[in-house]
Design a protein with these regions (language model features):
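Short beta-strand-to-turn element immediately C-terminal to the catalytic PLP-Schiff-base lysine
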Residues: 55, 130-131, 179
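Acidic, metal-coordinating catalytic segment for phosphate/diphosphate chemistry
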Residues: 14-51, 57
Length: 188
């Protein structure tokens, strides 16, 4: 459903690059507001990303533990990574990240949803998939990635979400959507 409230739309009337990094690009735009006034919008331009929640035949999900420097904590997440190019197929990115971070290959990968991660200051979208029919292989992370693979029942992952112990937004969405999907399929 596309929202059509045209009285809310802001029009860009100026733009400048503040920072141009390897991953992120910071912009400062001047916008015309719906009431005719102007405002400044600082935002992060991001190439987008894909994430995948791997589900083993025995009902366990595969998660990854890694240190996240910006929050200074080790997190429990689903495998994910940025699109290598703006036109990269998100499904190919999800497949690559699954293999790199966990070593697994999947027979089936299905789209769960797409989420806008931080709509107040970034244009990043993450495409979230579920992977089944998994075959184990060798993990091959990037040189600057240090990741531990963790397997647990989906029910335990849901419990960790509800306790606030899994708090990464893409992972919360994926775990809860997969649980819902599993319940719906069980009722068919």
């Amino acid at each position: 459903m596309e929202l059509q409230d045209k009285d809310l739309i802001e029009e860009k009337i100026g733009s400048e690059d503040i920072f141009d990094g390897t991953l992120l690009h910071v912009k400062r735009d001047t916008v015309k507001l719906p009431n005719g006034g102007t405002a400044t919008r600082e935002w992060i331009k991001h190439p987008g990303a894909s994430a995948v929640i791997p589900l083993l035949d025995d009902g366990q999900v595969i998660l990854v533990k890694q240190y996240r420097y910006p929050i200074g904590r080790i997190t429990l997440e689903i495998p994910a990574g940025k699109l290598d190019a703006p036109d990269e197929d998100p499904l190919l990115c999800a497949t690559r990240e699954l293999s790199e971070e966990t070593g697994y290959q999947a027979e089936n990968i299905t789209k769960l949803t797409t989420v806008a991660t931080t709509v107040g200051f970034s244009n990043e979208y993450i495409h979230i998939y579920a992977a089944t029919g998994l075959m184990a292989g060798k993990q091959h992370t990037d040189e600057d990635e240090f990741i531990n693979v963790v397997k647990m029942p989906l029910s335990q992952a849901v419990e960790l979400v509800t306790k606030g112990e899994i708090y990464d937004a893409k992972s919360v969405a994926a775990i809860l959507l997969l649980e819902r999907s599993q319940k719906e399929n069980a009722n068919v």
